[in-house]
UniProtKB/Swiss-Prot annotation:
Record: residues binding NAD(+): 154, 267, 415
Cysteine-cysteine disulfides: none
Cofactor(s) recorded in Swiss-Prot or TrEMBL: Mg(2+); Mn(2+)
Cofactor: binding comment: Divalent metal cations. Prefers magnesium or manganese.
EC number: 1.1.1.38
Residues the record lists as binding a divalent metal cation: 243-244, 267
Protein name per its UniProtKB record: NAD-dependent malic enzyme
Species whose genome carries this gene: Aliivibrio salmonicida (strain LFI1238)
Active-site residues, as the UniProt record annotates them: 101, 172
Keyword terms, alphabetized: Metal-binding, NAD, Oxidoreductase
Gene Ontology molecular-function annotations: malate dehydrogenase (decarboxylating) (NAD+) activity; metal ion binding; NAD binding; oxaloacetate decarboxylase activity
Length: 562
């Protein structure tokens, strides 16, 4: 027990206290607390430390053979004793992050209604569109400072999961706490239940969501607007993170709200920031700059285009023109290279088309240039996959790239593992160990010709917890593009490969707290510089970040009057 930490005064006692995950200590309640909070007889006699509890919990965790059972077990601890949950996860972060988030969370979302045990967060149905204020007032946590919200339409690479998408905000906020030190008392996961177009969900008798085709058009837009206004009335300073919205809604929602409220979209901006940070590290390791690269994307959705725009902005910051930077970025989707004159492109895709003058001398058997055609003609040095289509980084494609680039940078970022464009093992073999690889899902190190290559996971968890920590520590009112660019720069400075010439592109997850604090500092400094937070000294800023950083330790309790 941490007696040096001031006590917490609480009104709960007896079974009600044991049923409150944020406050429950289980067998760690002291003799005095058991007496004054009417817990005597409700717990076994032994009084244990959190270390003893964690040891038991980890042993139980290891007894489960498959990842889904492990996920369910950890979620049960989270819904019973949050302090113990976060101590356990932090003690085994590399082992458990793939269980509480990608890739296991994908299966958890698909099976959400089947494995449902207990409600967490808020389910805001379109049927309650006129009562959103009332629903927000029902939240278990009332001092909310960060919200992760989804409508469940584009869950990872798995598509429309309806309310099953709630697994993503729950998992994301668990990482805000485990990686970024955001107190779980300040978090709120929300799913906007606007129906589902997934026939499997609608036909499933176990499905717990609103059984209705998805609301679209102005009705959908107005519903989201009412939600945002209600959040602003209830928690005007809360950071809102949009998560796993479909392509047709993700970018428009971000554009509509980014200058009105403190918000960001992790799929677009967080993925872009961690990718740019990883690219900066890879460029340093390869002895070049990002502005010198030619970048090809497979996947031209909102996430891919968001990453591309972030790369272009970084290139421009390194001294080249916007037009030159755009000429070095090639977007390929199912119809081939995005080019001038292509029909049915979305606004954010139009900004990334290749001009005819840039491809007039290209050689191809087809008018629509394939990924291989781009490899052959553009001779890119960077290849990024955000397609959600497995296996499209073929041996032919990778080896064509390697012909023109000694150290190709290859990032197959699609999640979950089953959707990855190519495995690190194949990429390393096809390039004889020369490729610099980062993936979206976790992969084991690759051994080739007697050398071991650690594979960096280009995981948004390296970025968004630090952004959240920086924003909340200084009460920033916006999340700007410049703040996100600072997060990328700070991440790149943590790269073992860039710093030491060996190791992975990104630091091990065991260093995530150090990384998050570094990113928080960089993001907060930029927010202050841009006028989005009150000015303070660097020393005071670092102190604020340290003070805000929540740690999973049990506090002493004293009882207040009811």
């Amino acid at each position: 027990m941490n007696n040096h930490i001031r006590p917490l005064y609480i009104p709960y006692a007896g079974p009600a206290l044991l049923s409150t995950p944020l406050l429950n200590k289980g067998s760690a309640f002291s003799t005095t607390e058991r007496k004054y909070f009417n817990l005597e007889g409700l717990l076994p006699e032994a009084i244990e430390s959190i270390e003893e509890q964690t040891g038991r919990a980890y042993k139980q965790y290891q007894s489960f053979e498959n990842d889904m059972d492990k996920h369910i077990y950890l979620r049960n601890i989270q819904d019973t004793n949050e302090t113990l949950f976060y101590r356990l996860v932090q003690n085994h972060i590399s082992e458990m992050m793939p269980i509480i988030y990608t890739p296991t969370v994908g299966a958890a979302c698909e099976n959400f209604s089947n494995i449902y045990r207990r409600g967490r967060g808020l389910f805001i149905s379109y049927e309650n569109k006129n009562r959103i204020d009332d629903l927000l007032n029902n939240a278990a946590n009332q001092n909310v400072k960060v919200i992760v919200v989804t409508d469940g339409e584009r869950i990872l690479g798995l598509g429309d999961q309806g309310i099953g998408g709630m697994g993503i905000p729950i998992g994301k906020l668990a990482l805000y706490t485990a990686c970024g030190g955001i107190s779980p008392a300040h978090t709120l996961p929300i799913v906007l239940d606007v129906g589902t177009n997934n026939p499997q969900r609608l036909a499933d008798p176990m499905y717990m969501g609103w059984r209705h085709p998805r609301v679209t058009g102005n009705e959908y837009k107005d519903f989201v607007e009412e939600f945002i206004q209600a959040v602003q009335r209830r928690w005007p300073q809360a950071l809102v993170q949009f998560e796993d919205f479909a392509q047709k809604n993700a970018m428009p929602l971000l554009e509509r709200y980014k200058n009105r409220i403190c918000c960001f979209n992790d799929d677009i901006q967080g993925t872009a920031a961690v990718t740019v940070g990883s690219l900066l590290a890879a460029c340093k390791a390869a002895g070049s700059s990002l502005a010198q690269q030619r970048v090809t994307f497979l996947g031209a959705g909102s996430a891919g285009c968001g990453i591309a725009e972030a790369i272009i902005a970084q290139m421009v910051s390194e001294g080249i023109s916007d037009a030159q930077a755009r000429s070095q970025v090639y977007m390929v989707d199912r119809w081939g290279l995005l080019q001038e004159g292509m029909p049915n492109l979305l606004d954010f895709q139009q900004r990334l088309v290749q001009k005819a003058e840039n491809t007039k001398e290209w050689v191809s058997e087809e008018p629509n240039y394939s990924l291989f055609d781009v490899m052959h003609n553009a001779k890119p040095t960077v290849l990024i996959g955000v397609s959600g289509a497995p296996g499209l980084f073929s041996k032919e494609v990778i080896q064509e790239m390697h012909k023109h680039c000694e150290r190709p940078i290859v990032f197959p970022l699609s999640n979950p593992t089953s959707r990855v464009e190519a495995t690190p093992n194949d990429i390393i073999r096809w390039t004889d160990g020369q490729a610099l690889v980062a993936t979206g899902s976790p992969f084991d190190p690759v051994t080739h010709n007697g050398q071991t290559y650690p594979i960096a996971q280009c995981n948004n968890s390296f970025i968004f917890p630090g952004i959240g920590l920086g924003v909340l520590a200084i009460k920033a009112t916006r999340v700007s593009d410049e703040m996100l660019r600072e997060s990328s720069r700070a991440l790149s400075e943590c790269s073992p490969l860039a710093i030491n010439g060996s190791g992975a592109l990104l630091p091990p997850l065991e260093e995530i707290h150090t990384v998050s604090k570094k990113i928080a500092f960089a993001v907060a400094k930029k927010a202050i510089e841009q006028g989005y937070a009150l000015e303070i000294t660097d020393e005071a800023l670092m102190q604020k970040i340290e003070q805000y950083f929540w740690k999973p330790v049990y506090r002493r309790y004293k009882r207040t009057a009811f």
